[in-house]
């Protein structure tokens, strides 16, 4: 296979893998992704940062070979001296065994926790030389210096960031990434709204519960005097940021709960009664000047819903009752929300719940109880018998208005 490496800096190449066909990953939908890996040429050593998903060896190695060719290297000069493993997860370590077979003398630099994880994932690599590093440690490549920074739980316990000091390129692995698959590598080469939408979706589905750690890491990086040194951010998925403050600013807003005057409405329905309620609630919300994003769980999926919730001041969740319990599809979303812990963004988003019943009912109360435990401030609930009548439609409209009144207090 022939594949081209992309030069992104002085002696620095993107040598990643494009997964054009991936449609589901980490529990949400996407239109492909990239597994970004990088090759850095120093005067004395060549370093490889991260790799790709299992089965992607051929494409990654083809780009490695092309990078050596672009640097004018031939024969025995074409070798990797150092392997940097910022993160254990398989989409960034799945080619590690094949890389080590090709370059058996190259030590693997990673965190202490990563050593344990890599040996569990890849028993055949136990004999490799592992060198553990953390904040304050550096590695000289000859005219180029790699500085390491612990990134515990951003987003796994083993995670770390690597900074190429002279070029000001930060390699933060999953942080600041997006699940996008484009032939272009840089942020400014694709539509901005596409880039930021994908970044928002990535944060909402992966980083939200770590928001407090994000802010602490920004403080640490600032105190270490590293923030002003960052000229480029090269994440492990998606586009490379040539304007690093754009994504750092976005992360800061999301981590501190900065939201729009917007309500996310999510519902499912059997015979369209709950749907009618959702639409009436939406009218009440819009009458108060707030925007609405509406999601029908029969058609829409949870990762898009979570992306919307990230910058919404309030949510409205509705479902009918079946077998004395909430409609099953809503349970999937609720368990997902439980794990994301939106309250860690520093605000309690307002919420209402609603639904129809034909017997015992109780779904709105049940959903409200759960949302309260998940860090939402539940304002009110609404339940109707079978089909909402004219007065109940008016009540739903007023419920939307009430939700906005409470959201304005945030």
From Swiss-Prot:
In the N-terminal section; belongs to the zinc metallo-hydrolase group 3 family. Its cofactor is FMN; Fe cation. This is Coenzyme F420H(2) oxidase. Its EC number is 1.5.3.22. One of its GO terms (molecular function) is FMN binding. The gene is fprA. Residues 263-410 form the Flavodoxin-like domain. It comes from Methanobrevibacter arboriphilus. Optimum pH is near 7.5. 30% of maximal activity at pH 6.5 and 8.5. Fe cation 1 binds at residues 87, 89, 155, 174.
């Amino acid at each position: 296979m022939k594949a081209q490496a992309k030069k992104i800096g002085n002696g620095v190449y993107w040598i990643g893998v494009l997964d054009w066909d991936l449609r589901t990953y980490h529990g949400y939908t996407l239109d492909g992704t990239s597994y970004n890996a990088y090759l850095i040429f120093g005067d004395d050593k060549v370093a490889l940062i991260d790799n790709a998903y299992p089965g992607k060896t051929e494409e990654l190695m083809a780009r490695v070979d092309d990078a050596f060719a672009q640097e004018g290297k031939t024969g025995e000069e074409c070798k990797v001296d150092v392997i940097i493993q910022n993160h254990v997860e398989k989409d960034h370590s799945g080619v590690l065994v094949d890389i080590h077979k090709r370059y058996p003398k190259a030590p693997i630099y990673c965190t202490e926790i990563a050593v344990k994880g890599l040996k569990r994932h890849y028993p055949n690599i136990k004999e490799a030389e592992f060198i553990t590093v953390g904040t304050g440690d550096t590695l000289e490549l000859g005219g180029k210096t790699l500085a390491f920074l612990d990134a515990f739980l951003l987003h796994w316990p083993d995670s770390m960031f690597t900074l190429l000091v002279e070029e000001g390129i930060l390699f933060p692995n999953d942080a600041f990434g997006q699940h996008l698959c484009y032939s272009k590598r840089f942020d400014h080469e694709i539509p901005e709204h596409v880039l930021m939408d994908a970044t928002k979706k990535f944060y909402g589905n992966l980083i939200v519960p770590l928001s407090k750690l994000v802010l602490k890491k920004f403080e640490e990086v600032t105190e270490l005097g590293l923030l002003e040194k960052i000229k480029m951010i090269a994440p492990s998925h998606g586009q490379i940021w040539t304007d690093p403050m754009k994504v750092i600013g976005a992360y800061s807003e999301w981590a501190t709960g900065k939201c729009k005057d917007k309500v996310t409405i999510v519902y499912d329905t059997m015979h369209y009664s709950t749907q009618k309620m959702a639409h009436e609630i939406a009218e009440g919300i819009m009458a108060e000047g707030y925007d609405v994003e509406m999601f029908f769980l029969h058609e829409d999926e949870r990762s898009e819903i979570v992306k919307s919730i990230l910058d919404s001041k309030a949510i409205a969740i509705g479902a009918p009752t079946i077998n004395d319990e909430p409609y099953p599809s809503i349970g999937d979303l609720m368990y997902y929300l439980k794990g994301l812990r939106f309250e860690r963004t520093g605000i309690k988003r307002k919420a209402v719940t609603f639904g129809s019943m034909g017997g015992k009912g109780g779904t709105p109360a049940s959903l409200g109880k759960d949302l309260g435990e998940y860090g939402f401030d539940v304002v009110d609930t609404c339940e109707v018998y079978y089909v909402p009548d004219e007065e109940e439609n008016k009540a739903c409209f007023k419920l939307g208005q009430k939700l906005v009144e409470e959201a304005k207090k945030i």
